[in-house]
Structure formats: structure tokens, C-alpha cells
């Protein structure tokens, strides 16, 4: 009888302790937003997983900027938000989660030049699991091209950078070039209802957090442009796929196509950028 009492008491103690256990501290270490007090930004900063790109007008003094950051609840940043730094070169920040364990490194760049207008797709960022194409002025990266590669990484299909839909090859008209292909998304894509992923590259940013829930909204098209466009010219080769599919099923009598286009648009407060849902409206 005593043994039964002991078991009951132990169970009650376990239940009681579980009820009063403190909630675990936040393990997220993200920068959610960024501002430059006293400095006009030409568009909203592009915040990716480990990098932030801030755009200011040409001629802006970027040697003494004091960016301020909004972080996930409880997180801390080093150097402190509002610290004056010289952004003539990219600056590193470390965000530590509220639990004190998880950390994330961010590289923050400030671009004070006009948008590049000549592209050769020779340059990419090194040390990445997939190709990120960039434009440079001297040693400085002035623009990162966006693509859906970050979303494709979630499928787990690609083993090397060349297995992604958007990658670099060596047989361009002169030197290296961009290659876009359609890839299978494997089992992950099948259960998500997105069996294939087309290669793409665009000026803007890709929101990987929306890649699965709303892929069209994940594409944020465009950066500020202050010139009058006259033409779009370049070199390309294209080969249609062997079998056109829709929803994972073959469709006879149809062939896929390649799109290359430039869209110029004016922004407003309610529509700061176009995306895959309204780019052509």
C-alpha cells in the first residue's frame, strides 16, 4: 500500500514541476528591419538570411553611418544598434538569440552608386552552396542578382551548385555565362504541389520565407533606376524541354518558352515593389 502512495506522490511531483517550468527563451537571431536615421534610403533594405543591402543616393557620405536594427524578441546585436561605422566597405554584425546560444552573422553593405546597366554574368560570390551572381565596380559589389535558388535549396535535391536551376557555365559568347534550366523538385516538391522549378534571375530580392507558402509573392522585383531606357540587348541560346508538363502531368501539343524582359514602373506607398502576382498588370 505504501508503495502505491509513493508512486502517486512521484507522479504528482512530476506533473507539478512541468506546470511551473519556465518557457524556453527565444532561439531566433534575426534582423527584421533596418533604418538609417537622417539618411534617405532610395528603397527598402534587402534583408536576406545572412546579408543586408541598403541603398542610398549617389554622393551620400557613407563613411559615418549609424544603422539601427529591429531584432527578434530578446535578441542582441554586436556592435550595438546605432553604432557609427564606415560603410565604404561591408560591415559585419553578430546577432545573439535570447537563449544566448544561437548566433547569426550578417554582412551589411551600403550601395551609393547607380544601378548597373551592363551585365556579363562573370562574377559570383564565392563560398556559397549555390551561385549568387553579382555586379562589381572595382572590388566592390554594387548589386546582387536574385533568383529562386534559395527556395530550391529547401528541396534537398541539389548536391552541388551546378544542380540548381540557376547556375554558371563556361561556354558563353565570351567567357562565362548564366544558365537557366528547369529542375525536378523531388519528393519535397511533389508533396508541396510544385513538382518542377524553372531557372530564373532578376533584379530585386527573393523572400525565402514565402517560397513554399506563396512563391509568387516571394519574388520582389526591381531596384531604383534613374535613367530613360532605350533598349534591351544581349546574347542568348534557348532549347525547349522535351516534354511540356503542367501540375506534374505531360501536356501534348505545348512547348515551354523563354522570357527575357525589362519592366519599368513607379512605386507608391501601398505598392513599394512588384512581385509575381502583379508584375504585368
Name each model-derived stretch.
Residues 181-224:
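Secreted extracellular polysaccharide-interacting domains
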Residues 111-153:
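Extracellular carbohydrate-recognition regions
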Residues 231, 235-281:
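Short helix-loop boundary/capping segments
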Residues 168-188:
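Short carbohydrate-recognition loop motifs
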Residues 82-83, 219-223, 281:
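Beta-strand-rich interaction surfaces with strong enrichment in secreted/lumenal proteins
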Residues 1-30:
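Bacterial Sec-dependent N-terminal signal peptides
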Residues 40-47, 69, 158-172:
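Short, exposed beta-strand/loop patches in secreted or surface proteins that constitute
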Residues 19-119:
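Beta-rich interaction/scaffold domains
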